[in-house]
Amino acid sequence: MSNFTAADVKKLRDLTGAGMMDSKKALTEAEGDFDKAVEVLRVKGAKDVGKRAGRTAANGLVAHSGKALLELNCETDFVAKTDSFVALAQQLVEHGERTGVNSAEELLASEIDGKGVAELIQEQSAKIGEKLVLNRFAKLDGTVAVYLHRKAQDLPPAVGVLVQYTGRTDEAGDADARGVAMQIAAMRPQYLSRDEVPAEVVESERRIAEQTAREENKPEAALPKIVEGRVNSFFKDFVLLEQASVTDNKKPVRQVLAEAGVEVTRFVRFEVGQA
């Protein structure tokens, strides 16, 4: 007897983009464990499962003020582009940038002109007629470059990036840092450097790479080299400094930054509809 329901299958399909039968088989093999089911789908070759697994169903926008970034969600893109929704997001991010808050939870617990931010959002939700959610808020210190990206001209920004950097802080340095912010927006790195990747994530990638190679009937003697190559490919996909630069794809980002005299120390990337 299976230990999952049709709703579980749908959830896994929505999460990964895999087909119904593949999702059912993966859940069966994983005994209902979602994380294991995602691994099973990756080993079986489901395309882009790792990249799709962070998606959530939401509309909204990303707003910024100075060194702060905020994601405010709504139910439809119609509301996302209304003046009142855009103004609310801007009011909240400016308030967050001015005060000492550093997270969405702290921002929700703060007050604007004597009124709680959570209450303010609820009032606007009632006026607009849709559920509104303050999903994320972040703020960086030091020298920061900002980039916002619109997915459609008639919609507000859906992707926002903050890049904290040192080294050259003149106009040329700022241009280089903003170029990195554009890279982050487009290429979706999850980590700054290899050192930031948790050991359990690297181990999971090694396990998946080995299982996949065995499924492909690769020679046993070749497995270590194949696994190492696939783990390195993971780093090149998801680690910013290891990615090929969008300005010069023959060089990794770390080399381009070193040549420019810029060191990225931290970044934040928000995208509407992504976890």
Curated annotation (Swiss-Prot):
MF annotations from Gene Ontology: translation elongation factor activity
SUPFAM superfamilies recorded: Elongation factor Ts (EF-Ts), dimerisation domain (SSF54713), UBA-like (SSF46934)
Cytoplasm keyword on record: yes
InterPro entries: EF-Ts_dimer_sf (IPR036402), Transl_elong_EFTs/EF1B (IPR001816), Transl_elong_EFTs/EF1B_dimer (IPR014039), Transl_elong_Ts_CS (IPR018101), UBA-like_sf (IPR009060)
One cellular component term from this protein's GO annotations in UniProt: cytoplasm
Locations listed in the record: Cytoplasm
Keyword annotations: Cytoplasm, Elongation factor, Protein biosynthesis
Predominant subcellular localization, coarse grouping: cytoplasm
Chain segments carrying region Involved in Mg(2+) ion dislocation from EF-Tu: 76-79
Family to which this protein belongs: Belongs to the EF-Ts family.
Role played: Associates with the EF-Tu.GDP complex and induces the exchange of GDP to GTP. It remains bound to the aminoacyl-tRNA.EF-Tu.GTP complex up to the GTP hydrolysis stage on the ribosome.
The name this protein goes by in its record: Elongation factor Ts
Organism: Salinispora tropica (strain ATCC BAA-916 / DSM 44818 / JCM 13857 / NBRC 105044 / CNB-440)
Lineage, uppermost ranks: Bacteria, Bacillati, Actinomycetota, Actinomycetes, Micromonosporales
